[in-house]
Structures are given as structure tokens and as C-alpha cells.
């Protein structure tokens, strides 16, 4: 009988623990619309999200969901209609294109994460967050501007976990991820 070697695959630990519970209303959207270069991206969008809801946004229009997320996260301001986050919500956003967080960034991953944690964050804690997404030891000293697409996604997930938000806004988070990270 031949012994089977154990797998060398490592799985990240991805878990989100909010600092605070959400109240009775998470998000209310009323008659929201947006057009770009004369083209209506979406119009008359209205809904309300309650606690415990898990919502997926799907559209035939490539820009619609990403644009909607940018509006509710405050990145786009020239829209019609209104939206209101619940007073007890804190949001953490995973954008579809995360290159702006990494391109031209000459920081190590520890220092990259520190800019979102505050200058008083302990390096040991930052390394702990990075370790959860498989950047351990010397890998945590890798420069942020040389990461692959999947490594950038894992760093963004560490940033989001560290934020302890009670609302997650994820715009195509599994792009570039390896199978182990998707399963985690």
C-alpha cells in the first residue's frame, strides 16, 4: 500500500465580524437613476433592504451594477433620486476594479494595510490579517504594486475584514481569485 502525500494547498480564513448590529433599515433607495453620455444606465430604481437580507444585483447592462454601487458608496454624485443608509450601518466596499489601491503603491503589504487601520496599528495585528489571506512571513513584506490579480483581491478582503463593517458591498469579488479562496 502506498501512502498518499498530504495536499500542500492552503485555504484562507475569510470571515466578517461586524462591530455593531444593523438597525431596522439597512438601505432605502427611491427612484434612483443615472445616465452617462446621454445613455440611461438605469432609471426609477426603488427598494428597501432589511437586516438579514442577502441581496444580489444582476443586470444585462455591464455598467449598471458597478455604477449603482459607486453611487451608494459616494463615488458618483450626479444621479437622480435618493438613497439613505440606515443610521447604524457601516459599509465596506469591494470595487470591481481595485487597481487604484495598488498601482503606483510602493508600500509593503503590512504598510499598505496600515493605511486603512491607522498609524497606531500594531504590526503583529496587521500581519495577522494578512496571514488570514495567506500572506505570512516574508510574503507580508511584498510590495503592493507587484501583486497578481488574485493577491490584490486577497488584500482587499483582509482590508474589508479588518473594517468590521456590518454591510458588505461586493462588486464581482471572485474575479481573479483561486478556487481555494472562492471556497473559503
Spans of features found by a protein language model:
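ABC-family P-loop ATPase nucleotide-binding domain
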Residues: 2-26
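ABC ATP-binding cassette signature C-motif
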Residues: 19-184
Amino acid at each position: 500500500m502506498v501512502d498518499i502525500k498530504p495536499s500542500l494547498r492552503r485555504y484562507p480564513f475569510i470571515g466578517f465580524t461586524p462591530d455593531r448590529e444593523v438597525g431596522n433599515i439597512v438601505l432605502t433607495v427611491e427612484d434612483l437613476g443615472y445616465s452617462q453620455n446621454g445613455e440611461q444606465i438605469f432609471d426609477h430604481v426603488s427598494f428597501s433592504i432589511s437586516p438579514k437580507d442577502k441581496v444580489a444585483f444582476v443586470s444585462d447592462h455591464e455598467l449598471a451594477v458597478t455604477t449603482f454601487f459607486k453611487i451608494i458608496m459616494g463615488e458618483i454624485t450626479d444621479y437622480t433620486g435618493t438613497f439613505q443608509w440606515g443610521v447604524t450601518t457601516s459599509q465596506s466596499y469591494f470595487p470591481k476594479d481595485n487597481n487604484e489601491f495598488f498601482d503606483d503603491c510602493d508600500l509593503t503589504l503590512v504598510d499598505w494595510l496600515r493605511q486603512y487601520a491607522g498609524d497606531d496599528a500594531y504590526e503583529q495585528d496587521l500581519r495577522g490579517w494578512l496571514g488570514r489571506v495567506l500572506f505570512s512571513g516574508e510574503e507580508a513584506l511584498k510590495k503592493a504594486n507587484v501583486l497578481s490579480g488574485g493577491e490584490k483581491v486577497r488584500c482587499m478582503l483582509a482590508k474589508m475584514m479588518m473594517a468590521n463593517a456590518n454591510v458588505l458591498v461586493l462588486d464581482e469579488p471572485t474575479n481573479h481569485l483561486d478556487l481555494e479562496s472562492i471556497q473559503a
